[in-house]
UniProtKB/Swiss-Prot annotation:
Expressed in pancreas and in both adult and fetal kidney. Weakly expressed in placenta and lung. Not expressed in other tissues. It comes from Mus musculus. It holds the Pfam family PDZ. One of its GO terms (biological process) is protein-containing complex assembly. This is Partitioning defective 6 homolog beta. The keyword Metal-binding does not apply. Residues 326-340 have a biased composition (Polar residues). It is found in: Cytoplasm; Cell membrane; Cell junction, Tight junction. The lineage of its organism: Eukaryota, Metazoa, Chordata, Craniata, Vertebrata. Coiled coil: none annotated. Belongs to the PAR6 family. Its main location: cytoplasm. Keywords: Cell cycle, Cell division, Cell junction, Cell membrane, Cytoplasm, Membrane, Phosphoprotein, Tight junction. It comes from the Eukaryota.
């Protein structure tokens, strides 16, 4: 009688949500304002107070409408739990040192005899679950590869998510030049390249960007014909959600796709012949290590700081390496075994060398910028 009266009162008041929590063999019932549920820390303290366990670290879970037992450990999933309560919010509490993390997941409340029974009727003699290091408290993606189906195999489009943290994007860019092989011959064009990655930065942690990758687009805008300062401003303006299209210097890590059919999400039709002119492009990598003395470093504030430039002991001539090799059956670029080095016009010395396949040269001109 009392239970029916309490249920009728709770259903009659639209702004009140009834909560039924279980800890061990104890059940507690209380009400919350649905429109003002508060924060998770407040709800966590309320559960400790109701069950009289103020100094016990517990793991909180709730039953959703799909029969899943899901954790509550931050404000987002706490508000999600409140929104799905119809009309009762069922809470399950476990001690962290005795928690069964395998009980969380899809259809866990439907499989009552195996999963949920371990939570409702804990047995000290049952087999202990495997040790779990921790459960994620607040996790978000940091990077992703997008538009795989519409880009050539030699290109990669990377999205970096910053989420307002103080962690920098963490890569340096510089201007340089690359040589494109077109039906009209060799064409040398300026380009923007990644010169180095900051250790511990966002770009290095993703593993999707590397030194000497050529930057082709920034958030859908081509960088061709733009200066280094303009590209830097574009990246700073979109640093919160940066989408950068690059031509990786190491083409071996690219996804190999079938040129005729698309077998799965990782294999898709090669559209390089449809949407892009057929051409082979060779990038140039630095013959010598970059000097930190002539770098322009730009942080998130966007204010450049010029580092004093040291006078070089001698002037080194840049050499342009042209690699022309096609792999049979693939529309891409592969480094040959022997490569001739063509001197840049205006250089004093002409030098021909044989380089290993993994070694490339890059023309080093311009300043270097970090985001």
């Amino acid at each position: 009688m009392n239970r029916g009266h309490r249920h009728g009162a709770s259903s009659g008041c639209l702004g009140t949500m009834e909560v039924k929590s279980k800890f061990g063999a104890e059940f507690r019932r209380f009400s919350l304002e649905r429109s003002k549920p508060g924060k998770f820390e407040e709800f966590y303290g309320l559960l400790q107070h109701v069950h009289k366990i103020p100094n016990v670290d517990v793991l909180v879970g709730y039953a959703d409408i799909h029969g899943d037992l899901l954790p509550i450990n931050n404000d987002d999933n706490y508000h999600k739990a409140v929104s799905t309560a119809n009309p009762l919010l069922r809470i399950f509490i476990q001690k962290k040192e005795e928690a069964d993390y395998s009980a969380f997941g899809t259809d866990t409340l439907i499989r009552k005899k195996n999963m949920l029974s371990n939570v409702l009727r804990p047995d000290n003699h049952r087999k202990k679950p495997h040790i779990v290091i921790s459960m994620p408290q607040d996790f978000r993606p940091v990077s992703s590869i997008i538009d795989v189906d519409i880009l050539p195999e030699t290109h990669r489009r990377v999205r970096l998510y910053k989420y307002g943290t103080e962690k920098p994007l963490g890569f340096y860019i510089r201007d340089g030049s690359s040589v494109r092989v077109t039906p009209h011959g060799l064409e040398k064009v300026p380009g923007i390249f990644i010169s180095r990655l900051v250790p511990g930065g966002l770009a290095q942690s993703t593993g999707l960007l590397a030194v000497n990758d050529e930057v082709l687009e920034v958030n859908g805008i081509e960088v061709s014909g733009k200066s280094l300062d303009q590209v830097t401003d574009m990246m700073i303006a979109n640093s919160r959600n940066l989408i950068i299209t690059v031509r990786p210097a190491n083409q071996r890590n690219n996804v190999v796709r079938n040129s005729r059919t698309s077998g799965s999400s990782s294999q898709s039709t090669d559209n390089s012949l449809l949407g892009f002119p057929q051409q082979v492009e060779a990038s140039f990598e630095p013959e010598d290590q970059d000097s930190d003395e002539d770098d322009i470093i730009i942080e998130d504030s966007g204010e450049p700081q010029q580092i004093p430039k040291a006078t070089p002991a001698q002037s080194l001539e840049s050499l342009t390496q042209i690699e022309l090799s096609f792999e049979s059956g693939q529309n891409g670029f592969s480094p040959p075994q022997d490569t001739s080095l063509v001197p840049v016009p205006g250089s004093l010395d002409t030098e021909l060398e044989s380089r290993a396949p993994d070694q490339k040269l890059l023309e080093e001109d311009g300043t270097i910028i970090t985001l």
